[in-house]
Structure formats: C-alpha cells, structure tokens
Amino acid sequence: GPMGPSGPRGIPGPPGAPGPQGFGPPGEPGEPGASGPMGPRGPPGPPGKNGDDGEAGKPGRPGERGPPGPQGARGIPGTAGIPGMKGHRGFSGIDGAKGDAGPAGPKGEPGSPGENGAPGQMGPRGIPGERGRPGAPGPAGARGNDGATGAAGPPGPTGPAGPPGFPGAVGAKGEAGPQGARGSEGPQGVRGEPGPPGPAGAAGPAGNPGAGANGAPGIAGAPGFPGARGPSGPQGPSGPPGPKGNSGEPGAPGSKKGEPGPTGVQGPPGPAGEEGKRGARGEPGPTGIPGPPGERGGPGSRGFPGSDGVAGPKGPAGERGAPGPAGPKGSPGEAGRPGEAGIPGAKGITGSPGSPGPDGKTGPPGPAGQDGRPGPPGPPGARGQAGVMGFPGPKGAAGEPGKAGERGVPGPPGAVGPAGKDGEAGAQGPPGPAGPAGERGEPGPAGSPGFQGIPGPAGPPGESGKPGEVPGDIGAPGPSGARGERGFPGERGVQGPPGPAGPRGAGAAGIPGPKGDRGDAGPKGADGAPGKDGVRGITGPIGPPGPAGAPGDKGESGPSGPAGPTGARGAPGDRGEPGPPGPAGFAGPPGADGQPGAKGEPGDAGAKGDAGPAGPAGPTGPPGPIGNVGAPGPKGARGSAGPPGATGFPGAAGRVGPPGPAGNAGPPGPPGPVGKEGGKGPRGETGPAGRPGEVGPPGPPGPAGEKGSPGADGPAGAPGTPGPQGIAGQRGVVGIPGQRGERGFPGIPGPSGEPGKQGPSGASGERGPPGPVGPPGIAGPPGESGREGAPGAEGSPGRGDRGETGPAGPPGAPGAPGAPGPVGPAGKSGDRGETGPAGPAGPIGPVGARGPTGPQGPRGDKGETGEQGDRGIKGHRGFSGIQGPTGPPGAPGEQGPSGASGPAGPRGPPGSAGAPGKDGINGIPGPIGPPGPRGRTGDAGPVGPPGPPGPPGPPGPP
C-alpha cells in the first residue's frame, strides 16, 4: 500500500556520560583523496591506419592434362568460372588503454593524437578459383595404350519383339492301327478325285526373342544452372548452463569509510585550450585480432552464351569401343492366332485302294485335332528301319569340377611394364585413437599482458547482505523543511587528523554500507602452491586462429592407425611382354571326344596398316565462341610518387564560430539583503531516478589471476570440417600374385552351336511296314532352285564378329580459317596496385576568416547552501574495469572425446599405378550355359525315290 505519513519527531534524549579516556590504536591512514573532475577531453587523435588489403586469392592449380579422348559431340559452352573470393580485410588494431584522469589542473594541454593502430594481419588466403575451362583440343596425339575395359553399361532398353518363328516341324505320325483283315480283291476302282485340301496348319511355336542391342548413349545434356544458395540453418540450442561456482572466502573487512556526500553540481566547463602541437607519431599498437572469414560469395550470374567458334581440325577417329554386354532377354512374342477349322466334307464312298502315287510335297501342318479316344491296342508292329540320326541333344549339366591341379612352376618374371598412372587416393580414414596424454611440461614463463578486453556486460546484482541479528531503533523522522535552492559546492576542506576511536556502540550491527572504491593494486605476491586440480570447466568457444607458430621438432611416430577399407579394384595393368616359352611337358593321355567348343575370344588386333590417304580439306567452320572472361590481372606495381600538387585556391570564409566559453569570474558583487527565514515547507515528492552516471574511467589493470584449475572433459566436438585434399599417393608396390579366384557365376548363354556333322548312313533293315515319321533329316545338298516363294518374316539380326580396327588416317587438311569471332567481354580489372608514396604537400592556403566571438554570459551570484537533499536512487553498477593480465595457464585438462569424423575430404589426385601383378591362376571354369537358339531350317532336299506300296487298308464300313 502507499507509504503512511511520517510520525512526529521524537524528543532527543539526555546527553550520555563521557566514557573513560581510551587509548585506541593509531588510526589507519585516511582514504586517498577522490579524483578531481575530469579535465577537458583532448581532440580525438587521427584515425588509425587501415590494415592492408588481404591478398587476392591465388588462381587454382591447373589440372593435369589427361590423355586425348575420342572426338565427342560438341559440348555446350560452360559458364565462366567463379573468381576466387577476395581476402577479408584485416581488423584495425585495438587502441591502447586510456590513462587515468588526472586531477583538474589549470588549462588542460590538448591531448596528444591517438596512436595509430597497427596494420591488421593479412586476411586469410582467398579460396582458389574454380578450375578453368579446358582449352581447345590440341592435335591428335599418338595412339595411347589400350585403356582398361570399361564397366558394364546399364542394360539397354528392351528390344522389340522378335520376328515370328519358323513353321514347326511336322509332328510325329500317329501309331499304326491294328492290322486289318485282308479284303477281297475288289474291282478296279475309278480313281477318285482328290479330296479337299486339309485345314490350315496350326501356328508354329513362338520364336526365341531377339537379343536387343544396346542403344547408343544419348547426347550429354546441357549443364544445369547453379543452385541458389540455401538459407542459413537455424541457430543451435544453447549449451547447458555451467555448474554454480563455489562461494569465495570472505574478504578482509574494509576500512571504515563514511557515506559519500552528495554529488556536487558540475561546474561550468573551463575555457577551451588552444590547439596543441601535433604530437609525435606513436608506436604501432599491438597486432589486431584477425577477423573471422566472411561468408562465401554466392555464384555469379550465368554469362551470355558465346557464338559458335571456328571448327577445329577434325581429330582422328577414335578406336571402336568394345561391344557392350548383351541386353536383357526380350519378352517372348505373342503366340499366333490359330487358324479357323475347315468345314468337314461329306464322307465319300470308300473306293478301292489305288496304286500309290508319288510322294507329294509335305503340306503345311494341319491344325491340332481334338483329342480322340484311344483305340484298342494293336498288335506290335514289325521293327522299322533304322531312323536317321537325330540332332545332337542339348548339352548336359556340367559335371562336378575336377580336383584342382597342382600349382605349376612359376615362369620367369616378365619384363617390367611401364609405370601406370597414379591411383586415386583413398578416402580419408577415420581418426586414429587418441594417443596417451603426455607428461605435464614445465611451467612456461609468464605471458605478455593480453589485449585490452572489451568491457563485459554488467554483472548480476550481488546478493544482499544478511540483516543484523537485532534490528536497530528507528529514529523518529523530523519535519521536512522547504527544499532550498541548490548552491554551488563549497571547496573541499583539508582533511583533519583522525579522531580517537570511539567506544563500540551498544546497538546491533548496522546494515553493511555500500561497497567502497577499489583500492590500488598491491605488489604482486609470491606464487602460491598450486591448488588442487578443480573440475574441468565447460569448453569455451573456439578463439580466433592465432599466428602460425614456428615448426616444432618432429615427434615420434604414433601408433599405426586402423587399417583403412579395401580400396576399389585398380584398373588392369598393361599387358606384359610375353615370357620365353616353357619347357615342353610330357605327353598326356588321349582325351575323349569333346563337345563342340564355345566361340573363341576375338584374336589380338593385327599389325597396324599403312596410313590411308589424306582426307579432303574440311569445310570452313563457323566463328568460334566468345572466349572466357580473363583471369584477374596481376597486382600492379607500386606507382611512383606523383608531382607536387599545385597551390590550392584560398579557402572560403569559415563559418561563424560557436559562442565562446564563459569568461573569468567577475568581482564579487555586494552582498544582498538578508532575506527572512522562511518556514519549512512540506516534504517534496521523491524525484525521478537520475540517469545512470557516465561510465567511469577504466580501472587499473587487475592483479594477475590465480593459476586456473584444469577444466572438466569438454563435450564431444562438433563434426570436423572436410579434411584437406589428400596428397598424391606413393607409387604402389608390385602386387603379389593373386589367389586362385572363386568359382565364377554361370556364363551368359553361348552363341548358337554350329550344325553337327552328318552322321553315317544306317544299316538297311528288314523291310517292314512303314514306320512312324522320323524327325526331319539333316539338310541334304541343295536341290534345284524352286519357284520364288513369298518373302518370309524378318529374321532376327545376326551378330557378326567384330572386324579389326583399321589405322586412323592422317588428319585432313585444316579448313579455311573462319571469320574472326566477336570480341570477348572485357576481363576483370586487376587488383589495385600498391599506393605510391604521397607527393609533397602543396602550399597551405590562406587561413579563413575567424568567426566572431560569441557574447560572454554574466556569472550568477553564489546561492546559499541548501539542505542536504534526499539520497538519490542507487545508480547502475559501473562497467567492469580493464581486464587484468592473464593468469598462469592452468594444468591441461583431460582430452575430451574425439569429435565426430568430418566428411571425407576432396578426392586426392590419382596415385601412380603399381607395377602389374603376376597373372593369377585361372579360376574354375563356370558351368556350361544353356543351349543357344535353334538354327534355321535348311533348304529342302531333293525328292526321294517312291517308297514301296503300303499294305491294303482295312475294309470300309458296309
């Protein structure tokens, strides 16, 4: 609730009896006098010299030129490379600490100009620019060694459905019916007319699907635009608050100091001093802390596409690539529609069997009839003639692999092949385990005082003091008088000698007074014994990178890290020189007749043929594309000193100056009449809180801090940044002979086998009844040319063997030079050259007219000293003083857990290929592939002789 009214002032008590004369100890020396008011502030010193600009990023290292590849399709001009980022500008040095303000003296000398800050450190090295665009293709080099077989490309698209299969073979003849009774000899019948043609044959089985060839690779697409820079990620959560510190030991009791008196009215400013002479140039300040690197600039806008350049000379035709792997098996074609069944004809009268006519040509197979009911089993027929040998059946399943033969005597080593290219460096392995902590080193010498730290934020308010055990008596407030005018502060009196210490009061301890001013720093005490190792503090933020230290002595080799993952299989080495022939082995036993062998691998390429004739001159190419934007030019040389400047024109008249400072105090005026003593007015309302006082001058450097205790284990570090690009790997060691490979996967279906040889003719058997129709015979010699048949369905594409690549002809004569292309855009201007020395100063122009002096204000009469006002509200806590020198470093804490492994650094340049290893022993041959598709039906053989007449048929129905 609101404060109640003040009670009446109590009657003062009787004076106490004087106590016995005490002889107290001599009083402590008085507090030093308060600092006088701050003198007028000198003019600000000239600004410190800006740090030199950081070096521009060096251009990226040009990549090694790869072997000339085959002439590819003309690519779309790429966008211009992003220039390297310019180094960040170093920070200006931190100004030296400001000296303590001296007592107010007579007219203040103007302050010397501030020291120039030391030039900032060189900015970090710029990010190397992106790799430049490759130059125009050079002339065709000599034919390189055959490259390693490329990895299998993706499966080609499913080929179209193969052509319809060939008509199926004539089905086997049905079993012979029962032997009928021989009929009586009938009359010679009239030869009947030929019956109607049989119904159309059923569609043959679906042909095997054709092997679709791999489609040609598509043209490379145009490079996409660079993606927009992603938004900045959200700020991570704040770390957990550190543990609350232990309370410090209670400080020594401070000297008894009276409460500070009321703040005097600030006196009028003294007259401005004359401009002092320019001070000597100060020594350079300490090196500024390097600033953090700025954000990486976004990608530049895409340049305009250049016009087509002049076509270069046509390069030699590249070697024909190896055939790609067979595409996936196509889906089987749809079965053909069965033909419509013919209308059965009326049954004719059974005629007498006629004489057998000549064998007609085999008609197309009829449609499959409906399943008939099985007839009664007939008597066994006579043994038929030996049939013609059928086609060889499909290959049987692969037998169990034989036991591995003993390892042969190693042949003489082949000639050392040419050094292969450096293999690519493997990905950066995970960090090895942390080594054991080293022994604690000897304490180093005290470091130099650190830079003046930026004043920290105001600390939290201290804990309030504990109240006394017994509260003191509250005095009765007196009636408040009228507040008089505030007078000028009187001159400070001479401090009197300290009085004898009075007896200790009987009352309870009062509330602790406000904290006294900080005393002068005492002499540095001797180093105390090291305290116990404290708990390790939370790891602080990473400081700015310090300057590079001197290279240390080479340390002992650490323990070997864990073995890295097995690298990718290297490219096969060049084929070695053929070794000398080995000794002839013993003759082996004759082997059994083997199956027809699979198609052999294509032979080695033949000798290089003679060079072909020179090709005709190529056509005139279109104008070439606009050249790339030129790289920034080198830094210009330092310019020479310029000529002295001409005499400047007289300056314009200066502005009217501000009113001059107040003049000296005039003689004191006659004393005015004494006014009547006014009655005390009511107590005024409490005024608003005064604004916080100005920040006081920085305090003197604090004493050196105590030796810090080792901090606690820090939390796991954040994932490291990508490691630097790995160095080129060393040349590989000659590999050991490879182990025997595991059993390979089943091979792909082999090509169609060649037709087997014609079997020998069978022996003539006894003439029996006509046997069932045998399988189609092997194609006989070609008969006479028949009439031209209707065009058949398109066959599946054949696969011929790859021909040898002919030698590349010499490059054709260069075409006529094309029209000059348009002028490329102007390159970026080079870095600004170093500033030349300043030329001699020109003559000083005439001084402008001085403005009129402002009127001097009259000095007022000195007012009467008013009553002491109420104590103002406690001001804000002042800013922290200058940071004291850094204490001796604490004992190193235990090593925190290793941070998460950073992402793998960029892939290093390929290391040199090792010498080719020895040929390993051949693995176990894979199982035999499935049989190939059936070969095409051969041409019809010649018509055979007429067969013997068959037996008479059974009698017809009555």
Swiss-Prot record:
The UniProt record lists the keyword Electron transport: no
Principal subcellular localization: secreted
Presence of the UniProt keyword Calcium in the record: yes
Gene Ontology CC terms: collagen trimer; extracellular region
InterPro entries per UniProt: Collagen (IPR008160), Collagen_Structural_Proteins (IPR050938)
Bias-annotated ranges (Gly residues): 294-303
Comp. bias (Pro residues): 154-166, 769-779, 808-823, 943-958
Entry comment on modification after translation: Prolines at the third position of the tripeptide repeating unit (G-X-Y) are hydroxylated in some or all of the chains.
Assembly: Trimers of one alpha 2(I) and two alpha 1(I) chains.
Protein name per UniProt: Collagen alpha-1(I) chain
